């Protein structure tokens, strides 16, 4: 396993031909947008590419990813995208990875070549720099995917890890024709993973409380009914 500079990774990616890009379980916009943008970029320079993961692409992103057709590939080179640990890769956890690209400092995925940029607000910031180093022409479709990835991971630039580079990346993608307004509107009310988990916990607690209250009420009603129906004996 070797950590490499982004320039080195760009050179290495251009040397090989068949790629399988694997995103993490319970995929979010950043891993999906980054994976499909990289796939489009590799295909644009003559490479064969397939994007996959244990979970399907979320419905919210299908309209953007459906334009990226997968190639039939034998013996592909595996690329792990935006996955901080092997277990995040799900059923692909035990695959052999040649490349790993991520922005999580504690990344533990084993790969021949790794590039980790912990200061990046989203993996898409890294992908944009990488494909430019590869000499890829950034099309509107690529820009849309990367902008979607950026706004979902930064929650429309509201997270603490949103940086100056995040805004510069957004401006650059706008220059490439990204649908800033449309993608922004569709992702305006994104919730953080922590908030979603909290809401799920509260929902379960609420349902449990309602169930417990209903069960208690039924028990009290039953007890009253039994008491009222007991035979009365005169003395």
Predicted regions and their residues:
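Glycine-rich, phosphate-binding/catalytic loops in enzymes
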Residues: 38-39, 95-98, 116-117, 168
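Short, motif-level signal for alpha-helix interfacial/capping segments enriched in acidic residues
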Residues: 3-10, 81-82, 131-133
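Hydrophobic/aromatic residues located in beta-strands of well-ordered beta-sheets
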Residues: 49-51, 98, 146
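Hydrophobic helix-and-loop "lid/oligomerization" segment in the mid-to-C-terminal part
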Residues: 2-60, 71-76, 152-235
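An acidic intrinsically disordered interaction segment
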Residues: 1-9, 87-95, 119-127
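Active-site cofactor/cluster-binding pocket
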Residues: 56, 62-113
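Short alpha-helices
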Residues: 104-169
């Amino acid at each position: 396993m070797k950590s490499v500079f982004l320039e080195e990774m760009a050179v290495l990616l251009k040397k090989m031909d068949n790629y399988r890009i694997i995103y993490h379980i319970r995929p979010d916009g950043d891993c999906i947008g980054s994976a499909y943008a990289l796939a489009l970029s590799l295909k644009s320079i003559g490479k064969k590419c397939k994007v996959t993961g244990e979970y399907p692409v979320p419905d919210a992103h299908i309209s953007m990813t459906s334009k990226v057709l997968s190639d039939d590939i034998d013996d592909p080179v595996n690329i792990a995208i935006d996955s901080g640990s092997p277990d995040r890769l799900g059923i692909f956890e035990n695959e052999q990875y040649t490349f790993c690209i991520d922005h999580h400092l504690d990344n533990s995925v084993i790969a021949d070549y790794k590039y980790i940029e912990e200061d990046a607000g989203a993996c898409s910031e890294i992908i944009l720099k990488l494909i430019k180093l590869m000499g890829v022409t950034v099309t509107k479709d690529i820009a849309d995917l990367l902008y979607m990835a950026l706004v979902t991971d930064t929650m429309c630039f509201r997270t603490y890890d949103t940086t100056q580079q995040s805004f510069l990346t957004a401006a650059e993608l706008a220059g490439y024709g990204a649908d800033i307004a449309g993608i922004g509107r569709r992702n305006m009310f994104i919730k953080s993973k922590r908030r979603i988990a909290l809401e799920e916990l509260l929902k379960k607690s609420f349902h449990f409380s309602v169930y417990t209250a209903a069960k208690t009420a039924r028990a009290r009603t039953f007890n009253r009914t039994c008491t009222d129906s007991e035979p009365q004996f005169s003395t």
